[in-house]
Amino acid sequence: MNQQDIEQVVKAVLLKMQSSDTPSAAVHEMGVFASLDDAVAAAKVAQQGLKSVAMRQLAIAAIREAGEKHARDLAELAVSETGMGRVEDKFAKNVAQARGTPGVECLSPQVLTGDNGLTLIENAPWGVVASVTPSTNPAATVINNAISLIAAGNSVIFAPHPAAKKVSQRAITLLNQAIVAAGGPENLLVTVANPDIETAQRLFKFPGIGLLVVTGGEAVVEAARKHTNKRLIAAGAGNPPVVVDETADLARAAQSIVKGASFDNNIICADEKVLIVVDSVADELMRLMEGQHAVKLTAEQAQQLQPVLLKNIDERGKGTVSRDWVGRDAGKIAAAIGLKVPQETRLLFVETTAEHPFAVTELMMPVLPVVRVANVADAIALAVKLEGGCHHTAAMHSRNIENMNQMANAIDTSIFVKNGPCIAGLGLGGEGWTTMTITTPTGEGVTSARTFVRLRRCVLVDAFRIV
């Protein structure tokens, strides 16, 4: 065969590929499609392979193994692509989601028997579920949602934030490859090659999708609420306060607060966002925080920093956070005002008033406002005010059971952590399962596979009651 013959064969093969009637294959890697229509069609076919609980278990086991195996690579890619967060903390999140997200074991049918017979209540899938994921926790959210939604019998079409599309697509590809290698269906997890706002908006009303899961900020949640005609499960913003009273173990509180408020540079909505401390222990607490790789700013330095971090401050004191500084390292933020801090610095903190924009606004960066109050009653009241009715997360450090009980009742958040960092409420250092989707706007709270099922009732009249 001469060169001309080879060229003719190549042309014929290419022509055949271009004219094929099959849906377009993944354009980059497994599960990444050129069009939304093809992605959803592939996920719909794949979902039929999840009828068997054994197949769901097989797929989840593969996801857990792949998620943990590639946790560091995905963490590094996330920081490289988005510029936000810390590799070690993202690694910890990825591993935690792979290990700690519940699978099919949390789904139990209910059986009711009585004089009139037997009723069975089963957990049914929705089918293809749309999942909108954030740039702040990209790989961790993909791993978590993949396990939860597959456990519930669903396949998933992901709409990742465009700023984190590479790491999100990489995570989807790696998990798909693991599922297929283990003997599971192709394309249980899909996305599009070029995700954008229009893609997400199309998913809000896309035919054949019954459930929409949104993990993100206030804007995307409100957009979904406004435009979707589907069942919506939404995880939104928070401004978690942490209260320290005069009975607290201050050394433990200082360590927990710095750890939580600096974790992944404070880009998790559940991280501590404002510290409220009783005046009698405030100075000692802040001194101990400085021993935990935190640096205290002066009022003048905070005044310099405010216009760098916040724009368009309204009459409530709430501002728009500059995206350039979300999730950036404390050292880089300090350098923006010419301040050099030790390399190991994880957190900047500063005393403010309760009305200061730093206290009112969810900053999502390692800058923590500290507000003094006269007593624990004032602290709890201020915590409720600054939490802003998000019902997301709060924490308290105290040895007084009555004080903790009062705050637990008053704050009314989905997660309330006592004597530990807020991330303990996500299974990172505390008991309980992990999630990256904390659905406070729609009320489901800390999600699991149980959140993503349809309950179906099957009734047998006058039979099968055997006692």
From Swiss-Prot:
One GO location term (cellular component): bacterial microcompartment
Major localisation: other
EC number of this enzyme: 1.2.1.10
Example of a GO MF term: acetaldehyde dehydrogenase (acetylating) activity
Origin: domain of life: Bacteria
Alphabetized UniProt keyword annotations: Bacterial microcompartment, NAD, Oxidoreductase
CDD domains: ALDH_EutE
Pfam families on file: Aldedh
TM segment ranges: none
Details of cofactor binding: Has a very strong preference for NAD(+) over NADP(+).
First and last residue of the signal peptide: none
Hydrolase listed as a keyword: no
Pathway(s) where this gene product acts: Amine and polyamine degradation; ethanolamine degradation
Subunit details: Interacts with EutS, which targets it to the interior of the BMC.
Its job: Acts as the second step in ethanolamine degradation by converting acetaldehyde into acetyl-CoA. May play a role in bacterial microcompartment (BMC) assembly or maintenance. Directly targeted to the BMC. Its heterologous expression in S.cerevisiae increases the level of acetylating acetaldehyde dehydrogenase activity.
UniProt similarity note: Belongs to the EutE/PduP family.
Protein name as it appears in the record: Acetaldehyde dehydrogenase (acetylating) EutE
Phylogenetic lineage: Bacteria, Pseudomonadati, Pseudomonadota, Gammaproteobacteria, Enterobacterales
